[in-house]
Amino acid sequence: MEAPPPPPPLPATTLAPGRSRKLLLLPLLLFLLRAEAVRGFEAEERPRTREEECHFYAGGQVYPGEVSRVSVAEHSLHLSKAKISKPAPYWEGTAVINGEFKELKLTDYRGKYLVFFFYPLDFTFVCPTEIIAFGDRIDEFRSINTEVVACSVDSQFTHLAWINTPRRQGGLGSINIPLLADLNHQISKDYGVYLEDSGHTLRGLFIIDDKGILRQITLNDLPVGRSVDETLRLVQAFQYTDKHGEVCPAGWKPGSETIIPDPAGKLKYFDKLN
């Protein structure tokens, strides 16, 4: 008995080279997508470490080099109304002054220089060091007709609770400068320091002169505090130029040489310098 003939061969199908490569890559792509989804799920489910909780409590990642840090391009800063050599944006609100709630406004300081600075949040880390440093040296500012006001997006009630917390526990204790509440964020937005994505401000510092004109702006990223010595120096320099009409070179301090702002005057300065 003869064996049955073999079945006819199936017609060959030829895939285009491009389509063939796509089909080969499809399982790999599906695997990578599934792995990414699992990692994302695990990240959401994993409890925060103590360090991460501190960062979250402070309003975001605040140390250099962190991969999860929000990039500058993703920050949403409001258009600032604060312009150098123009009237400072008006503000008013409730502040804690000597343990009491009082209404405070920018015009209360007309006739004096004002150091007006923003800090991110109460009960954090760098912020109390700045407020205490300025508060402990308020007499040096007042001796040159200058006042200091600190502001954050916290309420006056949170401010008071922080003041009533001992310094050894991270509180402020008794302080000599007002803490202004900006609960609706309007002041922070007007001064261009409010981070919409984080819900708090950058470390902004503004020097306003005795006529209400904005003379200086400093904006620090979150991890680094500001210098009381440098702020005092800047106020003294602006006051000197207001009174004498001369200009202050780099690093100028009271008693140092200044420059008469004309061609002959500058030559006298550079001749002494060199």
Curated annotation (Swiss-Prot):
Q: Which Pfam families match?
A: 1-cysPrx_C, AhpC-TSA
Q: Name one GO biological process term.
A: cell redox homeostasis
Q: Could you list the residue ranges that cross the membrane?
A: none
Assigned GO CC terms:
cytosol; endoplasmic reticulum
Q: Which UniProt keywords apply?
A: Antioxidant, Cytoplasm, Disulfide bond, Endoplasmic reticulum, Oxidoreductase, Peroxidase, Redox-active center, Signal
Molecular function, one GO term: thioredoxin peroxidase activity
PTM section of the record: The enzyme can be inactivated by further oxidation of the cysteine sulfenic acid (C(P)-SOH) to sulphinic acid (C(P)-SO2H) and sulphonic acid (C(P)-SO3H) instead of its condensation to a disulfide bond.
The EC number on file is 1.11.1.24
- Localisation per UniProt entry: Cytoplasm; Endoplasmic reticulum
The miscellaneous comment for this protein is:
The active site is a conserved redox-active cysteine residue, the peroxidatic cysteine (C(P)), which makes the nucleophilic attack on the peroxide substrate. The peroxide oxidizes the C(P)-SH to cysteine sulfenic acid (C(P)-SOH), which then reacts with another cysteine residue, the resolving cysteine (C(R)), to form a disulfide bridge. The disulfide is subsequently reduced by an appropriate electron donor to complete the catalytic cycle. In this typical 2-Cys peroxiredoxin, C(R) is provided by the other dimeric subunit to form an intersubunit disulfide.
Q: Give the function comment from the record.
A: Thiol-specific peroxidase that catalyzes the reduction of hydrogen peroxide and organic hydroperoxides to water and alcohols, respectively. Plays a role in cell protection against oxidative stress by detoxifying peroxides and as sensor of hydrogen peroxide-mediated signaling events. Regulates the activation of NF-kappa-B in the cytosol by a modulation of I-kappa-B-alpha phosphorylation.
> How is this protein organized at the quaternary level?
Homodimer; disulfide-linked, upon oxidation. 5 homodimers assemble to form a ring-like decamer.
Family indicated by similarity: Belongs to the peroxiredoxin family. AhpC/Prx1 subfamily.
Q: What is this protein called?
A: Peroxiredoxin-4
Organism, per UniProt?
Bos taurus
Q: Specify the taxonomic lineage.
A: Eukaryota, Metazoa, Chordata, Craniata, Vertebrata
